[in-house]
Amino acid sequence: ASQSFPEAKVWGDQSPIHTFYLPYINKVFPRARYMHLLRDGRDVVSSMVTRHGDDYLFEAVLRWKTSLKRINRFQKELTPERYIEVRYENLVREPEPTLQKVCEFIGIDYTQRMLDYWKLPSTIEHKYKTFHQNLGKPVFDSSIGKWRERLSKQQQDYVMKNLAVELHELGYLDASDG
């Protein structure tokens, strides 16, 4: 981050693997603020299976569930000034007010240009990498609920059997979800 934007006063990293190292990161950066970008676990699992193949279903379910537990345990140690939860669905459906809330949390001014991230040269160079191909596009919400199309009935049943409690607690289940 510091190489691409040397003037940056705030930097971040969104690697999900960091959920395994939160206590250590907190020791190194004791004033760090944490934003949990929460997404429907079914869509997360669906995305991972699409990327890694059908054999990854078990691992994807386990990773989402384990990461969620680790984040929930860790955030209890933080003051409200150091932790914010943002729903992915809110970010893509209502990007401006959600981003304003995030900016307030991290202590920077919101600008309309932030929604034009996909036009930045640093974004353009990454959008050609398969994993980051959507960086070159404006915010879109068509990936919400994609699990219904991407996962087979058998896969959906497995996901629901293993994530129903968490999905319910987070408010992701409704009457149509059985």
Task: Locate predicted features.
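PAPS-dependent sulfotransferase catalytic domain
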Residues: 1-55, 65-80, 84, 162
